[in-house]
Amino acid sequence: MPNPGLTDEQMQEAIDAYYNNGEVQIRAAEKLGLSKTTYEHRLRRARALGFRPGVQDVEIPEFPENCPDVEAFLDLQEKRFEREAEYRSAVNWFRIKIKNNLPVGINWFGDPHLGSNGCNVKQLRKDIDLIKNTDGLYGANIGDTIDGWGDRMARLYADNDVSRTTEWKLAKWFLEEAGIPWILWLFGNHDNMHSGFTKYLKAINAASIPMLDWQAKFVVEFKNGEEFRVNAAHNHKGVSWFHQLREAMNTGYDADVYMAGHHHNWALMEREGPHGKPLLYARCRGYKFHDEYADHLGFQDLQGGCSVVTVFNPVAKSTMERVRGFKSTAEGAEYLTWLRSRV
């Protein structure tokens, strides 16, 4: 209902109380039985309208405040904070549960850059077909699904035969129509160049595939209780293997697999951790070739590692056989098929 505003009598009363109580607001407020805040508001209003001790003949309407009540707003902030804390706790080392004890693999799609003239579509299609026809092989997107040029870099669309609309259609195809059994999507720097793109992906994510910005830490859990911890990021801090080793040491070797993309190169490294468990460090190259930026900086145009496959064996006879890495979808799919046939 509309605010009736202060009456002349209320404002006059506030002025009179002020002068009758030694011009001390707290005493005037107590005299009128008002809170200090309410009294100060009435006094300010009366002064603004020129009220003086005595009777006034003019009544001016008072308008309600158009901002939220402070306490109500603080209550809302508290709920938002709690929900954010709950979300962060849920996504930190979330669990992907395998309902049997057969070995499984994750095909880590390196930066796809769909729509780019340099996207190796032929190789991408081959890898997708292999995944669709290999039992136990799942897909994970390391990020940079599209070029997604934004701000000043939007001019680079002139160098490709694609529009932003077409890029988004390609991303939808990759997510929903390519037939890939996804378990994870990460958002890279290119995905975030246009703020609406990641929101669009989340909106069409009908299968509720985990979609996280930049990094995901999760556990692959098998029926027999075996667990494999994965620390995947579009890129980990630093670009050398030393940095990934240091990250592993700094985090107490909290993962079995450290995976990254971003730099359009690939590598695999395996070593034994301090607890006698194998550690796998990998970077997938991605599908963007013929990259002028890389050419200008003199980077090698690597041919392998578009995707990297990690295979997890929950029934391995040797601890060192628990995790294996492969530099291509074809190699990983072949090994996984052979391994599952022996279980």
Please annotate each region the language model reported:
Residues 1-105:
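Acidic, histidine-bearing metal-coordination/catalytic regions of metal-dependent phosphoesterases
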Residues 96-106, 217-231, 276-279:
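Beta-strand-turn-beta hairpins that frame and shape the catalytic cleft
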Residues 98-115, 119-124:
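An acidic-aromatic substrate-binding cleft motif
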Residues 229-231, 235-339:
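Conserved beta-sheet core of the metallophosphoesterase superfamily
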